[in-house]
């Protein structure tokens, strides 16, 4: 082939640059230009349906790509002095060697370390085990696949971050329309409008706010057994759903957290064998404007839930059929907040706690036709001034002049007139 001064490829065909050959000044608008080991392409401009593929051992220099043009760099291939413009896509792993610039700045991949790439329009980077990527931007249809470690990733609308088992991510930001799928480990993630699905991985210090959704233990199709989140913060506009696995420690301020029932919810999902139950442990604080809804059957005995003024805790037993419903919790502190106990048509409701203390209200919702004096009782240590309100299914008040009176033995309380 030799060295060409000017080439135009727009016919959709495939052209190969073989060992020892050099092609220069190519305008690639349709079709593929493949640079094999020992081959070299210089000053290639890739747009439209054009695709420049640099195979292992091949070299590309001064490549420009944009407007739907694609550059693929295989493991062991080299592409230097790249210029990426709007609409371009690059596909590679951390075994490639590249450097260049795009509208957001400069980027490089060398010796297993990637920094600064802009991945969009189907572009993707595969971070291999033992390798690292930092400051990656994911936009429309851009993907980052992590078996190694990554940090400071920004996922914008249409972008997707995937962290596989053994992979780790830290200090990532998921904006509106962005997606984070986690099966490895993550820390200090900010969900600022996007979605995060923990698929049996572990995350810590995740912040959920501004219309974003966090899901633990599911991708919407299957439940995953070993998922865990620690020190979760759910702020105004944020929503967290626990479908399977463990939530340990949370602060909820203006957001909503839902622990789904492990027995009746998710019945349309494929369930992993020996999947973990839905479990809440550690310290949970519900601040002003916060709500937590817990499905019946979730494991709560190792939790301490504090409900501040303006916060609402809902224990939902509406799926339980029959006359009796028992709610089992660790510790509940009512600091001016409300505890709702939701039942179907139960005539006897029991709340089992280690400790129930503070000042606040318990609101019991039922469609039962009759309310007896022993309609509700509490087993466990009870202290403070706790009033009780009973409503029907539409939350119309049936009786509100009631309070919990601690038993003389100090290990329970019963319903008494206020």
Curated annotation (Swiss-Prot):
GO biological process, one term: DNA damage response
Organism: Escherichia coli (strain K12)
Superkingdom of source: Bacteria
Protein name: Protein YdhQ
Disruption phenotype: No change in cell adhesion or biofilm formation. Increased biofilm formation.
